[in-house]
Amino acid sequence: MNGPDTKIPQATAKRLPLYYRFIQSLYNSGKLRVSSAELSEAVKVDSATIRRDFSYFGALGKKGYGYNVQHLLTFFRKTLNQDEVTNVALIGVGHLGTAFANYNFLKNNSTRIVIAFDADEDKVGTTTQDVPIYHVSDMKEQIKANHVDVAILTVPSQFAQSVADELVEYGVTGILNFTPARLNVPAHVRVHHIDLSIELQSLVYFMKHYSQSAEGVKS
């Protein structure tokens, strides 16, 4: 078992929320235990990978028994800080930004969009799904007032870096970047780049060049 300060592989870390969501659904349905094979079928991750992921955290299950659902749920809630709410700011309330506001992490009680920003004066002063929209010039004051740690960036790509610079200056330490721009940020700031056009091109490439006959290709 790794120590509490040991960092697990990033690929494993990215799968933890996936495991948590399924375990939560099992718990809500009244299921008491689950096998790695059942987990594998549900989340489309092979059993060996699941067992390896879980091994980083010690003995989460028992051979021949599987995993206790309530124990797993408690573990993942603690590991993923599900009892702590992370406030998120939405920067850019266009079509994509509005979709995020409408969704607002309905299946995740630990993150919520609390504030949005846009340069369009017609949107400023309004709300979208109860999320107030402020002008981008108000970011400094409102991000600090709302204790925002994470920002979702859906602005035009030519403005992405300058907006990111401001966010970092105002104390944001995590950015989910949906623009094509590759952001330069300090080492203490985490950025996840999600370029939908690249994801689509990648999907088409894998469809054409990799066999789907076994268990499919998953990212």
From Swiss-Prot:
Cellular component per GO, a single term: cytoplasm
Keyword Transcription regulation: yes
Main subcellular location of this protein, as a coarse class: cytoplasm
DNA-binding region: 18-57
Listed GO biological process terms: negative regulation of DNA-templated transcription; response to redox state
Record carries keyword Magnesium: no
Location within or outside the cell: Cytoplasm
Key words of the record: Cytoplasm, DNA-binding, NAD, Repressor, Transcription, Transcription regulation
Residues that, per the record, bind NAD(+): 92-97
One term of GO molecular function: DNA-binding transcription factor activity
Known role: Modulates transcription in response to changes in cellular NADH/NAD(+) redox state.
Quaternary state and interactors: Homodimer.
HAMAP family assigned to the protein according to its UniProt record, in alphabetical order: Rex
Similarity-based family: Belongs to the transcriptional regulatory Rex family.
Name of the protein: Redox-sensing transcriptional repressor Rex
Gene: rex
